[in-house]
Amino acid sequence: IPTRGFLGYRGEFIIDTRGEGIIYSQVIGFRPYIGEIEHRVVGSMVSMATGKALGYSLWNLQERGVLYIGAGKEVYEGMVIGNVSKGYDISVNPTKGKQLTNMRSKSSDEAITLIPPVELTLEMGLEIMNEDEYLEVAPKSVRLRKKFLTETDRARFKRQK
């Protein structure tokens, strides 16, 4: 396996072995480029709204896949906020709040418990990034975003392709 094949594998290895595995690599020599390395195809959860991510909407979205952001984070249209195991992207609204009513009942006021989001690192971002995405590296954060931020631009590009 070439060295570029190990890019991002460390995190997956730790999850697979539950932290008990030992990984070892050795340089045998240099060889010419053979071709692309296949990787697992995952889809992205793409924000379709700009604003502050709310706990209620993230609570509903965490059932669909793994989230990269927590409640209270600023999001913008076209930002990748998580991934889904399906092979295609889905547009979601992480800024949607709970509908307020005058009725009070025990069943409607459930406590929201969020699964802690996965902290996106530079290595992980390079591993899971698709061809139609950019990796934004800022001093305080690492984010994924689509090349075309609006949903209409992404659909137009897909049709031309």
PLM feature spans:
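Accessory interaction regions appended to the cores of large information-processing enzymes
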Residues: I1-K161
